[in-house]
């Protein structure tokens, strides 16, 4: 619910549908000045979302920009074979991790700028203001979970044992909207 409310308020969706499985660049795709990708773990080869679309392969090459993209691994040998071509086709590259910049150079011979996580572009005061506007307040003491990838059910009992009765907030649980409501 909170994600939908955020989308309705802040995201202006186009009426056109991008056919991500097609190699065709529809005319409207070419009408944009730039296509930007970048997110936490967007290029992690262990994630199912690390497809050609995460590397903007549907967009005209000259309009591709990677802004603070994250690979989230340190071993170049775990990269998918296509990564060299896909990353090499992005003319403007910035990544979050120093090691990611090194990997890009190893794979493509290109340099990538290291740029901070975009959430750090917001001041502490702004973050505090948004937290104060939250409709639901967090308990005074709680444990936070943030698991990359798929968390297996077998870890649930271990988590409950370790947090010793504290409230548990799973930041990647899209169904736990009570912690995602902001004014």
Where do the model's predicted regions map?
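Helix-loop-beta element that forms the nucleotide-linked donor phosphate-binding surface
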Residues: 102-119
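A short beta-strand/loop micro-motif in the catalytic core of glycosyltransferases
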Residues: 91-97
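A short helix/loop element that forms part of the nucleotide-sugar donor recognition site in Leloir-type
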Residues: 126-137
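Aromatic- and Gly/Pro-rich donor/ligand-binding loops
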Residues: 1-85, 132-133
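Catalytic donor nucleotide-activated moiety binding site of glycosyltransferases and closely related
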Residues: 69-72, 103-104, 147-183
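Alpha-helix capping/helix-boundary segments
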Residues: 42, 99-100
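Conserved acidic residues
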Residues: 30-34, 91, 141
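Conserved donor-binding/catalytic core segment of Leloir-type glycosyltransferases
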Residues: 136-150
């Amino acid at each position: 619910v909170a994600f939908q409310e955020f989308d309705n308020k802040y995201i202006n969706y186009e009426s056109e549908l991008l056919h991500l499985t097609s190699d065709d660049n529809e005319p409207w795709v070419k009408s944009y000045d730039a296509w930007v990708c970048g997110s936490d773990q967007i290029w992690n080869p262990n994630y199912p979302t690390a497809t050609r679309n995460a590397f903007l392969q549907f967009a005209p090459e000259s309009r591709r920009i990677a802004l603070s993209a994250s690979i989230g691994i340190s071993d170049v040998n775990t990269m998918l074979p296509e990564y060299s071509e896909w990353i090499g086709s992005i003319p403007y590259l910035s990544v979050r991790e120093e090691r990611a910049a090194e990997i890009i150079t190893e794979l493509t011979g290109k340099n990538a700028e290291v740029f901070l996580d975009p959430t750090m572009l917001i001041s502490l005061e702004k973050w505090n203001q948004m937290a104060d506007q939250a409709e639901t307040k967090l308990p005074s003491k709680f444990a936070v979970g943030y698991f990359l990838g798929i968390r297996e059910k077998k870890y649930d009992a271990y988590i409950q044992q370790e947090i010793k009765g504290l409230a548990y907030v799973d930041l990647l649980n899209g169904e736990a909207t009570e912690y995602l409501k902001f004014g």
